[in-house]
Structure formats: C-alpha cells, structure tokens
UniProtKB/Swiss-Prot annotation:
Membrane topology: Multi-pass membrane protein
Biological process, per Gene Ontology: ATP synthesis coupled electron transport
Reported impact of P60R: In strain: Isolate LOKO4.37
UniProt cross-references to Gene3D superfamilies, sorted A to Z: 1.10.287.3510
The protein's Enzyme Commission number: 7.1.1.2
Known catalytic reactions: a ubiquinone + NADH + 5 H(+)(in) = a ubiquinol + NAD(+) + 4 H(+)(out)
Species, as recorded: Microcebus mamiratra
Alphabetized GO MF terms: NADH dehydrogenase (ubiquinone) activity
Keywords: Electron transport, Membrane, Mitochondrion, Mitochondrion inner membrane, NAD, Respiratory chain, Translocase, Transmembrane, Transmembrane helix, Transport, Ubiquinone
The family this protein is said to belong to: Belongs to the complex I subunit 4L family.
Subunit organization: Core subunit of respiratory chain NADH dehydrogenase (Complex I) which is composed of 45 different subunits.
Subcellular location: Mitochondrion inner membrane
Main location: mitochondrion
Protein name, per record: NADH-ubiquinone oxidoreductase chain 4L
Length: 98
C-alpha cells in the first residue's frame, strides 16, 4: 500500500506542477485539473477499501460527480472563450470587462 499511495501522491503533485507551469492555456489547465481529480478519486477509493470504512463508500462516487460537473463547466467555458476570442490563451483575456 505505501508504494501505491506514494505513486498516487506523485501523480497529484505532477498534475499540480503542470497546472502551475501551463496556467496560460485553458485546455492544459483543464487537463491537469482532471489529473488531480483522478488521483484524488483513486487515493480515496484505496483508503476506503483498505480501512473498510462502510459509511464512506459513497464518497468516491460523489467526488466523481463533482469532477464531471467541473469538466462540463470547464469545457463549456473553453468553447465559449474559443468562439469569442479564437484561442484559449488566458493571459490575453480581460475577464473583468463587461
């Protein structure tokens, strides 16, 4: 178990590092965010199954629901920004403009 959890934590750290490095492009940020959610889902599932926490079996499913909602909202925002501006480069956008 420790080597698996270390690998999952490293995957989360790599996705977080990717989010920090490629924050100027929306598509890269969304992919890194999905990687972070996937590693959180995997780690929470392994912890719940190893500790046999019967009351928490629905937590990974709830995490997947939130990840799906986040992905849908992110893709809708990506399509809107791409249609309006022609690219997903975040630094060229002035989001405070009405």
């Amino acid at each position: 178990m420790p080597s698996i959890s270390i690998n999952i934590n490293l995957a989360f750290a790599a996705a977080l590092l990717g989010m920090l490095m490629f924050r100027s492009h929306m598509m890269s940020s969304l992919l890194c965010l999905e990687g972070m959610m996937l590693s959180m889902f995997t780690l929470s599932t392994l912890i719940i199954l190893n500790l046999q926490l019967t009351m928490s079996f629905t937590m990974p499913i709830l995490l997947l629901v939130f990840a799906a909602c986040e992905a849908a909202i992110g893709l809708a925002l990506l399509v809107t920004v791409s249609n309006n501006y022609g690219l997903d480069y975040i630094q060229n956008l002035n989001l405070l403009q009405c």
